[in-house]
Amino acid sequence: MLHTITTITEEIVNLLKDDPVRPEIPATDRINSNSRIYMLKDGEQTKAITCVKFLEAVPTGVEDMVGLVESATTAVFYTIWSYRPGAGRDLIIAAQKSIEAEFPRIQTYVTLSPKTEMARRFHLKNGARELRENHSTINYIYK
């Protein structure tokens, strides 16, 4: 079941320590009026987590995700990790559906991914295409 995290709890802070991509981003930057954490759970067991920032444009780096915006049109999946095989894919699909329902102005779904073969395989296998290669990141776009 999908959970949308909008408040910081001790459980969330502990789970964020497992973030393999962007562990340096504090919980307060992951949960605010322009940011959400989506968690896929099976009962009490966490299956996968992704963090999403809502912006007005596609970022090229983490520094582009600072601050709040008034009229976001882009959902940026900037980190994802799973505790079970296949859960990351299920989470991307469920989170996108949830965002579509909650934020109808969001038109673009992209990632801010590290330049790794693992990230490339994951996103291309799950229906994304490469949008843009940046200095230290790659943006993949989901339809």
Language model features with spans:
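Short amphipathic alpha-helix that is part of the acyltransferase structural core
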Residues: 1-29
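Conserved acyl-donor/pantetheine-binding loop and adjacent beta-alpha core of acyl/acetyltransferases
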Residues: 51-75
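Short, aromatic/basic amphipathic alpha-helical patches
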Residues: 121-129
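Conserved catalytic-core motifs of GNAT/GCN5-like acyltransferases
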Residues: 129-141
